Amino acid sequence: MFAHEFNHFPPSLSNSGEMNYPSNKASLIHEILTDCHNAPDEPSEFDPTSAVLIDGGRLLHQFPPRPLMTFRQYAEMLSKGPISLYLQHHQRMDIVFDTYIDGSLNAATRQGRGKGLRQRVAAETKCPAKWSQFLKDTRNKKELNIFLAQQLTTYSYPEGRQFFATCEEKVLSNTSFTMADSDQEGADTRLMLHAKHCLSEGLNRIKILIDDTDVIVIALGIFHKLQSSYHFDDIVIEFGINKNHRSVSLKALANSLGPSRCLAIPLLHTLSGSESTSALKGIGKKKAYEALKAYKESEAILGDYFSNAFKTLNEGDSAFKTIQRLVILMYARTSILESIDDLRMELYFQRSQNIELIPPTSNALYLHTLRCIYQAGVWSLCLLPFQNRPSPCEYGWQKTNHTSMYQPVWITKGEAIKECREFVKCSCKSEICTRCKCKNAILRCTLLCSCKCDDRVSFD
C-alpha cells in the first residue's frame, strides 16, 4: 500500500495539488559557501578591460523610479545613474531581461507569485507609485523591458564603452557590435550566454549582479566547460543588498568543490526545490546538500544528467535507484533501505502518521525527478543561443483541455484508497482481534494495525 499515494497528489511535494515551492532556495548557496572555506567573500578590484552583467530584474528592484517620474525620465535616470557609473569602471555592460512567452513552462510557474496592477508603458506615462505591485504583472514587465532596452541603447556613454540590452529574442547595443538572437526565456541562463560572449571577445574578468541565486547554481555547472574553452581571470557573482550583500569568486568556489560536485549541484538544487520544481516538505537545502556529501556515488549520476541535457530516465533504471537512495538519506541519514516505498512505511509509524513528513512514493518521486531533469537540461544548454528543447510533456508535465498552462503529473499509479479495498486499521491491544474496526468492515488486519494477529496482510 505504501507504494501508492494516499491522495491523487503527493502531500510531500504539493499543497492541495499546487506546487510546493521552496521557502528559501538561496540557502543551498549559503551551505556551499559555508562548506568551501577557500572561496573568498570579497574579490579584488576589476581592471578596466572587464565586463559587468546585470539581471534586469535586479536593476528594476534596486533602482525604482522617483515619485511622479515618467517612463522616459526613468530610463534617463538609469542611463545617467547606475549604467554610467558601471561603465566608468568596466569596458562593457549588459542588461539581461527575462522574456515572457504565453503558455510556456515558465509562465505556468510564475502564476504562484501573485497578481499585480496592470498599467501600460509609454514614454510620457507616469510610473506607478506602487512599483513592486506593478512589477508583479508580467504584461507590465514585458512592455517595460522592451521600452528600456530600446531607450537605454540610444543614450551616450563614456567613449569606447559597450552597452548591450536584451529585447525579447534580440540583443540591442549602442555600438556596431552585435550578438546573436536567443530563444532563452530566463535571464538566469541568458546571463551565462552573455558571459560566454564576453570571454570570446577577450574580456578576462566578469562581474555578474543577480537577483536570483539560481545563477550561481547554473554557473557552477558550466564553469569548468568555460574554463576549458577560454582563458580568463575570474567570474565574480554578487547577490543581495546592504547587510545581505555577498560577492563570490566563481573560480575559487568551483575549484574548491571540484568538477564532479559542480556538475551535480544543479540537479540537486532542482530535486530539493527550485522555481519550477517542488520542494520536499521537511527537507531543506541543508539536508539535501548533506545527503549529497554523504552519498558520493550520487554525484556522478546527477552530474551525468546535467551534462547530457534531457537524458532519458526510466523508473527501473539503476540511475533512478541511486536518486531514490539519495532522497532516502535526505529523510533518514542512517537508513540502510534502498526502496523509498519501504522508508515511507517505516517513517509513517515513527512520525505519528503525518503523511506530509514521509517521502513521496517511488512513482511520484520518479515524475518529480523527470521535471527536475527537464529544468536542469534547460540550465545545461545555457551556452547555446537556441536550445531546441523537447516538450515538457515528456518530462512529468501535462496540458489539460481546460487550461493552456502546464500542470505537473503527480502520479501515474492509482492512489491507495482506490488500490486498497479499505484503508482501515484497528488499535487492539490483544493478540487476536475479535471485535474491532477491521472485523466490523469484514477485513483482515494489516501491518498498520496495533494487534498481533497471525493472519495480518503484508504490503508486499
Q: What role is predicted for each listed range?
A:
Residues 1-460:
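Noncatalytic, typically N-terminal accessory segments of nucleic acid-processing enzymes
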